[in-house]
Structure formats: structure tokens, C-alpha cells
């Protein structure tokens, strides 16, 4: 409730309009029975046509007023709930942009998607009901009780007796739905995760002819979700039929016990009709309140899941007031860096790493799988923070930089190229929105992407499917490199970014890259020796430690690990074509 209110209170004008229309709704709904009683007692029973017409026109006017009030209420609630969920999702997404890789790993991407969509929608539904009935219900209930007591105090006990039966139903449903709601959202997380993995890995599934197996697994996951949903629907479905039966029993009891007052004239027929209407509205208010109570457990679960996102401690401090500019550009130094992934401090993946890189230099990293190459370069843009030691960029500790300013200095090209839905031009301008067409042309030419771009009718306006799925792996990789070239950073980081390219394209691309990286620091993580032979310095990693450094020729003579890697590739084109 407090989480929802923190957003709704930002719009006092809409809340005031909502309150006004809710009060109008209550006045109309409780005014109609009173007018109906007057029509019966003053118009129908004495057969006074003039009074009947008078009260008829009054009723017609109030009904019109009620229609206007209902329209205003729906409009105000619609504005409040849609604006609330918009702001809520914007805040959640902004918070996610502050997350480091560690926070994403803690919660899981599929769960985050579920929370941004399904959980936010649950809160929107509850806010809709609360704004419509949260004000109407107490006003209606209090007003109905007062009218019941003033109309026929002797029959009021019947309504009072009905309330505990309703309360028991509400309590039972509320207690039972909370754990089921918690399980429901977790099950939905698993279902979304399974669907996401399978849709992403569709080609692998088909390649191994595992469609039937995956269908069975999905059906099993879906069955768990459906079973839990059925349990929830059965519980919440109890409320309305039980309430209806209790209300019917109450009306029958009122009519039965009203026979004597009607017979002795102490109660008029019109007043009896009005009393039944007031009693109906009193219990209907309780029904609305019950619906809010049955919705609340699931809303509380969704609210907690969203607050987890907002309250998650950020392991990477963005340092908004940090350094934004430096006199030099591209100087990089690792000073005795040790790194362990969060929660795994006993098992560091990097030990005592120290090296320097200057603008114009190319530093390469090579080693066996799991030696820490990618972990090392991910520390520079602070995807993770070092455990011990420090990393300096232009003489400043990366933790002392404004995080955005630090990342502006870096062009990071991951092994798995990620492109966004949109045009090729939009993707290339991702790091520099005002890049000219000439800059795009140059970057495409350098990255060896120009040929396949030119082969498409719309060239840079070619639309890319989700994740660039309408391109080959090599084409996506070249566009990823071109995107970094357009950005023109101080430090280029190629995290095994040439692996999807053939050897000839790899060699040509690296040769052309020198045209734009002459004043920048270039770091290359690679598996191919041929990719890094021309580097100014090659650093050999083994089990997170530096076990060798030097040029290709120096390492071939002095470092056994490097020599083994190189010799294993001697028969491949990686060395012969260089």
C-alpha cells in the first residue's frame, strides 16, 4: 500500500477528482432508495400522480448525475493507475541501469522481466480497485449503516448478524491466498525463464531434434503454473457465491421480520424497500472490501518483489560527483590487482595482476579457457570492482571516476555481439548519437562491414530483427566493432571479438583498425595466436596469474605455455595466412 501510495500522491489533482466522483457515486446510490421510498409512499400508494411524476423526474436527474460521476471516476482512476505504473516502470528500469552484473546474476533476467511486467500490472489492478472502492466502500458502509438505523432500528440486528459470516469468508480467503500468490509469481518466473532460454536457443534445439523433449518440459512447467492458478481461482471464486447466498438470506430475513411492523403500520412499504436497498449496499460495501482483501496478498507479494529491485544495494558506486575529465587520454595501469567474483572471495580468478598500457600501444591477452582473460578486461569499465589493488585510467583510480564518464572513455566489444532492434545506422550511432553518415561509412569500411551493408537496398537504414537475428555471426561482430569505431574511445577492448571472423577478414580488419586506433590504447583478448602476433606486448595468463609477457618472438623462445598454444595452431591458417 505504501509503495503504491508513494506514486499516487504525486498527482493530488487527480486524487481530488477521484475523491469528488467517489462521494458523488455514494450520494447517488444511497439517494435512489430514498427517492424510491418517497415514490412508493407518496405517489404509488395514495395514487398521487403529480407526486409520482415529481419524484420520477428527481430520480431521472440523480441517475444522470450518477452517470456523469461514474464517467469522471473511471477517467480519474484510469489516469492515476496508468500514470502510476508508467512512473513505477520508469523508476524500476532506471534502477536496473545502476545494477552491476552481480545484481543481475542475483535476481535473474527472467525474474526481472516478470517483475517489470506482471508484478507491476498486479499493482496497477489493485490500485484500480482501491481507487474505485477504497473511498466508496467506507463512505457507502458508514452512510448505509446510518440510514439503516434511522429507517428501522428494530430490523438493524439482521444486518449486524450477517456481517460476521462475511468476515469469516474474507479472513479464510485472505489467509489461504498469500502463500499461493508467492508461489504463483515464482512459478511465473520459472516459466518465463524456460520460455526465454528455449526461444533464444531454438536453433540448438532443432539441431539436436529435441523439440518434443522441450515441449514436454514446457508442458510440465506450465502445468505447475496452471495448477497453482486453479487453486487461487477456486479460493477467490468462493467469495462471490457465498456472499450472494448470505445477502439473499439477509433479505429473506428482513422481509420475514418486517411483516409485523408493516401490519401495525409502524413501517411503510417504501421504507421497507429503502431498508432492503440500504442493507444491500452495506453488505455490497463489505463485498467490495472483501475483494480488496483477497487481492491484497498477491499485491503484497508483487509489491515486495518490486521493492526488492529498488532496495537492492548497488555493488558498483556510480560516483556521480567523481572525476569526469583528465588531461591525458588512454593511459591504463593495473596495480597488483586481485579479483574474486562477489560471494566467492575464497576463490579469486585473478591474482596480483600488474601491467601498464600507453596510448598507441596494443596489449594482448592469451591463455587457456578459464585463465581470467575476460574477467580482467571487464574490470576496466567496472562491470565488477577489484577485490584488492587498483586500476588507473589516465592516472585516476577507476573507482574515483564518474561511472558514466569512465565508460565514455572505453569502447568495449564483447565476444557475443549484441545488436538492438532498429536500423544499422541506429546501432552504429549507439555510442555517438550525432555521428555523421561519413563517420558511419568510414567505420563500416574499416570493420569490413561495408560490403554486406552495400548489398542491401536500404544500406544503413536496413532494419535489424531482434538481436540482429537476420545477420550472420560474422556480420554482427563486424557491426559491433564498427559501433566502437564510431564512438572513437580512448581505450578499445576487444574481448575475443574476432572469433566469429574468418582469418582473412580478421587480418584485414586489424590492419585497417590501426588507422583509427593510433592514438588509443588497444586491449585484445584472443584465442588465436595469429590475431595477436603484432601486439606490442602479449600477456600470458594461467589460472589467473601472469606467467609471461613480451612480444610474439620473445614468448616463443621464453614461455612454454605460449609456445604450446602457438604450436597447436601452426597447422592452421591463423599463423600461415598472417
What are these regions (language model features)?
Residues 48-51, 143, 147-161, 231-305, ...:
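Helix-loop-helix
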Residues 314-327:
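Pre-NBD coupling/linker segments of ABC/ABC-like ATPases
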Amino acid at each position: 500500500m505504501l509503495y503504491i501510495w508513494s506514486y499516487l500522491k504525486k498527482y493530488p489533482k487527480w486524487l481530488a477528482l477521484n475523491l469528488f466522483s467517489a462521494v458523488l457515486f455514494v450520494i447517488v446510490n444511497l439517494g435512489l432508495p430514498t427517492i424510491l421510498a418517497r415514490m412508493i409512499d407518496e405517489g404509488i400508494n395514495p395514487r398521487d400522480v403529480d407526486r409520482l411524476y415529481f419524484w420520477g423526474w428527481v430520480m431521472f436527474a440523480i441517475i444522470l448525475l450518477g452517470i456523469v460521476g461514474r464517467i469522471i471516476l473511471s477517467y480519474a482512476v484510469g489516469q492515476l493507475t496508468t500514470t502510476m505504473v508508467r512512473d513505477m516502470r520508469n523508476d524500476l528500469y532506471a534502477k536496473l541501469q545502476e545494477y552491476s552484473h552481480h545484481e543481475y546474476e542475483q535476481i535473474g533476467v527472467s525474474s526481472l522481466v516478470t517483475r517489470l511486467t506482471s508484478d507491476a500490472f498486479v499493482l496497477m489492478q489493485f490500485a484500480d480497485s482501491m481507487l474505485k472502492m477504497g473511498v466508496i466502500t467506507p463512505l457507502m458502509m458508514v452512510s448505509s449503516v446510518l440510514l439503516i438505523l434511522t429507517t428501522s432500528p428494530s430490523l438493524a440486528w439482521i444486518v449486524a448478524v450477517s456481517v460476521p459470516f462475511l468476515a469469516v469468508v474474507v479472513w479464510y480467503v485472505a489467509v489461504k491466498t498469500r502463500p499461493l500468490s508467492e508461489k504463483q509469481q515464482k512459478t511465473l518466473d520459472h516459466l518465463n525463464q524456460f520460455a526465454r532460454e528455449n526461444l533464444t536457443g531454438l536453433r540448438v534445439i532443432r539441431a539436436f531434434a529435441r523439440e518434443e523433449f522441450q515441449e514436454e518440459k514446457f508442458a510440465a512447467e506450465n502445468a505447475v503454473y496452471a495448477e497453482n492458478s486453479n487453486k487461487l481461482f477456486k479460493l477467490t471464486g468462493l467469495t462471490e457465491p457465498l456472499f450472494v447466498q448470505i445477502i439473499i438470506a439477509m433479505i429473506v430475513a428482513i422481509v420475514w421480520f418486517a411483516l409485523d411492523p408493516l401490519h401495525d403500520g409502524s413501517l411503510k412499504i417504501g421504507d421497507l424497500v429503502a431498508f432492503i436497498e440500504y442493507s444491500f449496499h452495506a453488505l455490497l460495501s463489505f463485498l467490495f472490501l472483501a475483494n480488496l482483501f483477497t487481492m491484497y496478498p498477491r499485491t503484497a507479494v508483487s509489491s515486495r518483489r518490486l521493492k526488492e529491485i529498488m532496495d537492492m544495494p548497488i555493488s558498483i558506486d556510480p560516483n556521480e560527483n567523481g572525476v569526469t575529465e583528465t588531461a591525458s587520454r588512454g593511459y591504463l595501469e593495473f596495480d597488483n590487482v586481485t579479483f574474486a567474483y562477489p560471494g566467492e572471495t575464497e576463490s579469486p580468478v585473478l591474482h596480483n595482476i600488474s601491467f601498464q598500457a600507453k596510448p598507441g600501444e596494443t596489449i594482448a591477452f592469451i591463455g587457456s579457457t578459464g585463465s581470467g582473460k575476460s574477467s580482467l578486461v571487464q574490470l576496466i569499465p567496472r562491470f565488477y570492482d577489484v577485490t584488492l589493488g587498483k586500476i588507473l585510467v589516465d592516472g585516476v583510480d577507476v573507482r574515483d571516476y564518474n561511472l558514466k564518464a569512465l565508460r565514455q572513455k572505453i569502447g568495449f566489444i564483447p565476444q557475443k555481439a549484441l545488436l538492438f532492434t532498429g536500423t544499422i545506422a541506429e546501432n552504429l550511432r549507439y555510442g555517438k548519437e550525432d555521428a555523421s553518415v561519413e563517420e558511419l561509412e568510414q567505420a563500416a569500411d574499416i570493420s569490413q562491414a561495408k560490403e554486406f551493408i552495400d548489398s542491401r537496398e536500404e544500406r544503413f537504414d536496413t532494419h535489424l530483427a531482434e538481436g540482429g537475428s537476420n545477420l550472420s555471426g560474422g556480420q554482427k561482430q563486424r557491426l559491433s566493432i564498427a559501433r566502437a569505431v564510431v564512438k572513437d574511445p580512448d581505450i578499445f577492448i576487444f574481448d575475443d571479438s574476432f572469433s566469429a571472423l574468418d582469418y582473412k577478414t580478421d587480418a584485414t580488419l586489424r590492419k585497417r583498425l590501426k588507422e583509427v586506433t593510433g592514438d588509443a590504447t588497444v586491449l585484445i583478448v584472443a584465442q588465436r595466436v595469429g590475431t595477436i602476433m603484432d601486439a606490442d606486448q602479449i600477456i600470458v595468463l594461467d589460472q589467473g596469474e601472469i606467467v609471461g609477457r613480451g612480444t610474439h618472438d620473445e614468448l616463443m623462445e621464453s614461455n612454454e605455455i605460449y609456445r604450446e598454444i602457438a604450436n597447436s595452431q601452426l597447422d592452421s591458417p591463423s599463423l600461415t595466412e598472417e
